[in-house]
């Protein structure tokens, strides 16, 4: 039981009409409320190599299957690279690109808990715009590479707020050396 009104309701884009429209009508009539949920979050469709993911096509893949070849942080970054409301395409390119980005960004890993500046957080406050947040991390990386210490600190803080940098720098480097999953599941 969710109550008469609640904060967030989520579902796939395919459920907006008629399912969610009917759900709203029924809930509002049953409870006499002005709204059912304060926020609606509809995720985009998932494809694999630009084809609809389905068991009948034989291209259905689970996160556990992907984790056999990629660290959980790589998978997380790949997923966050597309806005939740847009279609997401699982493919090797996005996973490899995400791994390469993490390899670069870990150079500026800090185990200190630094407060993230609003200018770096504002993207998440705008409809969880993770692709823009990641674009900003790329900019922070460029500045950090040229010696800007504040950018290095903000890069680390920005990655952490996205649930990245779940391993310490040494563990990530060791992971790179062996080329297979050796990290524990924490932070994945």
Language-model segments: which ranges?
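Basic, alpha-helical terminal appendages of large translation-related enzymes
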Residues: 134-188
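Helix-loop elements that line ligand-binding/catalytic pockets
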Residues: 87-90, 94-149
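Charged/polar, solvent-exposed surface patches and flexible loops
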Residues: 29, 65-68, 77, 100, ...
């Amino acid at each position: 039981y969710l109550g008469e009104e609640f904060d967030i309701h989520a579902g796939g884009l395919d459920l907006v009409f008629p399912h969610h429209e009917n759900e709203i009508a029924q809930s509002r009539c049953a409870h006499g409320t002005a709204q059912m949920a304060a926020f609606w979050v509809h995720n985009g469709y998932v494809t694999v190599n630009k084809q609809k993911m389905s068991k009948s096509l034989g291209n259905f893949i689970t996160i556990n299957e992907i984790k056999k070849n990629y660290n959980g942080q790589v998978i997380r970054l790949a997923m966050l690279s597309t806005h939740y409301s847009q279609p997401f395409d699982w493919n090797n390119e996005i996973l490899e690109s995400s791994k390469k980005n993490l390899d670069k960004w870990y150079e500026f890993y800090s185990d200190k808990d630094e407060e993230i500046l609003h200018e770096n957080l504002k993207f998440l406050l705008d409809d969880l715009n993770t692709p823009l947040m990641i674009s900003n991390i790329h900019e922070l990386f460029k500045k950090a590479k040229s010696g800007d210490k504040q950018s290095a600190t903000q890069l680390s803080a920005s990655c952490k707020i996205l649930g990245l940098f779940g391993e310490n720098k040494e563990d990530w480097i060791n992971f790179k050396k062996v080329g297979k999953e050796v990290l524990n599941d924490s932070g994945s």
